Amino acid sequence: MNWDLRTNAEDGSQRMLNALLPGTVVPAHHHPHSSETVICLCGRMDEVCYDSNGHETERFHLCPADGAYGCQVPAGVWHSVEVFEPSVIFEAKDGAYGKDGSELM
């Protein structure tokens, strides 16, 4: 479930809260023209990065209770999440959802 934080549909950015449960599947994807800021507000999860062949290259542990609040996923990097406990994240990037050139792996 996500909550769009933009003030109107013409806003050219993506800012949202995203609630994720353990077992949530987010297909690996990338944003070719924008980096993505991910801030974990509660819960515990990993942001997982991949190369273009689908091999894991980096993993960011996100858990505010551990002092690990967020990460920056560079433009063009394939990524997904692994959720370990109910979590809420804030996500921000350039380009409106569905209109930013994002692609699934």
What name fits each language-model region?
Residues 33-53:
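Glycine- and acidic-residue-biased ligand/ion/polar-headgroup-sensing regions
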Residues 1-28, 34:
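A short glycine-rich, His/Asp/Glu-containing loop-to-beta-strand
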Residues 24, 33-34, 77, 85:
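A generic "binding-loop/recognition-motif" signal
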Residues 28-29, 47-49, 71-73, 79-84, ...:
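Short beta-strand His + acidic residue motifs that chelate non-heme Fe in jelly-roll/DSBH
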Residues 54-61, 78-105:
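Double-stranded beta-helix
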Residues 52-72:
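Extended, positively charged loop/linker patches that create polyanion-binding surfaces
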Residues 17, 37, 80:
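Short, surface-exposed charged micro-motifs
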